[in-house]
Amino acid sequence: MKKGFDNAKYLQMQSQHIRERIAQFDNKLYLEFGGKLFDDYHASRVLPGFEPDSKLQMLLQLKEQAEIVIVISAQDIISSKVRGDYGITYDLDVLRLIDAFQGMGLFVGSVCVTMYTAAPEVEAFEHKLNSVGVRTFRHYKIPGYPNDVAHIVSDDGYGKNEYIETTRPLVVVTAPGPGS
């Protein structure tokens, strides 16, 4: 029986297209990876031939060029939001992801705390990351988002956010789960 999806071809084509896009954009490409990078059993069920770790395998082909930025909402840290599939909080999942990525030779450049709110839980999380050498950046709530475009693009909107410094040509943005 022929499978409906050629995983090897996918990996080869996707990584080649990403390399081409990096070259097109002056050697800097930002990609958001939604969904699971590890254990994507849903995708492998609905696309026979797609392997549960296909996205990760594709990233590994680009690991010398790739830098990962993990994003987590301050609200998810404060509320101790739990992943339904793993039963762990989002902040613990960020730590798990860092270990997993680094264990595979991928570079985690930083963690960005979005919707930043000063709270002991958030500051303890940032301190924990900084103490193990992971840089953290803060992005703030923007009043009027997404409708007040003038405010959003002002110094009090996006301009208030800390600039996330990156060093590699491919910046992969991911999160511990939906909504973060």
Question: What feature does the model see in each segment?
Answer:
Residues 1-145:
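Long, basic/Gly/Ser/Thr-rich N-terminal segments
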Residues 16-20, 152-164:
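Pre-Walker A adenine-sensing motif
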Residues 24-28, 165-170:
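A short, charged/proline- and glycine-enriched loop
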Residues 51, 121, 164, 178-179:
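Short, glycine/acidic-rich beta->alpha junctions
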Residues 100-104, 160-165:
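Short amphipathic alpha-helical segments, especially helix-boundary/capping motifs
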Residues 139-159:
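N-terminal pre-Walker A segment at the start of P-loop NTPase domains
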Residues 168-179:
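Glycine-rich phosphate-binding P-loop
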